[in-house]
Amino acid sequence: MQILLLTILICSSFLFPSSSFASHIELRPCVEIAHCVREEWEENNIENPFEEIKTFIENTPRTEIVEVDGDYLHAEATSKWMKYVDDLEVSFQPESNILSIRSESRVGESDLGVNQKRVDLLKSKMF
């Protein structure tokens, strides 16, 4: 019985990739527009925009970077009162200077504009 359970556990670990968020270049589109924001723009004013935005995210309260892979970053932002977790992704394509940001709530239909405010704040720090 224990061998069967162990086999099932090991096999099920192959069903889901270790990072189900992005391809590390192109961020997924937002499916539910009410609680997801995805924007991208060309960034020519800052020498290393990915490092700049990474440093800003590292210093943002209640936000923890959980993965960095080259020019891709995945962070989790936790709300102050209800402790909801939102996923924040940043991808930079150095060959085209395109910086992409995606912020999505994990639960609920609406985020009351929190993800848009987060993306706007990150954009404002880049200009």
Where are these regions (language model features)?
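Sec-dependent N-terminal signal peptides
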Residues: 4-13
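Ser/Thr-rich, low-complexity intrinsically disordered terminal regions
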Residues: 16-127
